[in-house]
Design a protein with these regions (language model features):
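Surface-exposed, charge/polar-rich loops and edge strands
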Residues: 1-50, 58-216
């Protein structure tokens, strides 16, 4: 009898935990939806002149600064095709630069772009976090012409300047060989699927528990 009671407690405890996890995912779903709405509203506002006090993502900005004679080519797949994001640093002040994502270029155009001098055009775009390297991202190889990730510390050393913590994603047109970026918010929002999974697991557990109790 004591063994049955112990298993009862285990089933109840497990079901409670799984239901809590499902409910937590629902809370996260509403929170993420609110965040996406706020960010979409930011992109509907008029552009502001870029300044160092901007610390939020998806703020529309215009940048009229001098670009450095330096280019980074970041490995990036576009619609399944291998290519590169073209990243160029722009001077914010004497000690700081901001990185600008100019857009995407095909692999066979990279040598041409290396020789291209970009004029000090007014950049229109929006702010975004600089993507951090994850466990599955290969290490950068100095022998290669492109990067797998932007390594802030090493880049600051090579430029001898601080890097503004947000990237500017340029949406205005630039070189004819570069496919410009779009205004888009890329935030994963799979919390509904996760919640359904947890609730389904709870339902299966309850059915199994009732079947077990009937047999006991």
């Amino acid at each position: 009898m004591s063994k049955i009671k112990s298993l009862d407690i285990l089933f109840i405890f497990f079901t409670f935990i799984v239901l809590c996890l499902g409910t937590w995912q629902i809370i996260r779903l509403y929170s993420k939806n609110d965040l996406i709405i706020n960010l979409e509203n930011n992109l509907k506002k008029s552009s502001v002149s870029f300044n160092e006090s901007i610390n939020e993502e998806y703020i529309k900005v215009s940048l009229n600064k001098k670009n450095l004679d330096s280019k980074l080519f970041l490995y990036y797949l576009h619609k399944g095709e291998i290519g590169f994001k073209v990243i160029i640093p722009y001077e914010v002040n004497d000690s700081q630069v901001v990185l600008v994502d100019k857009g995407w270029v095909k692999k066979d155009k990279i040598n041409l772009l290396k020789k291209t001098l970009f004029s000090n055009e007014v950049v229109e775009g929006y702010t975004k976090k600089i993507q951090k390297k994850n466990l599955f991202t290969p290490d950068n190889n100095i022998k290669e012409d492109f990067l797998y990730s932007v390594e802030i510390v090493s880049l600051q050393k090579s430029l001898n300047k601080n890097i503004y913590p947000l990237l500017i994603v340029q949406t205005s047109k630039t070189s004819k060989d570069i496919i410009p970026n779009n205004y888009e918010i890329r935030l994963s929002n799979n919390h509904l699927q996760y919640a359904i999974t947890w609730y389904a697991l709870a339902l299966v557990t309850i059915i199994f528990f009732l079947f077990y109790r009937k047999k006991a």
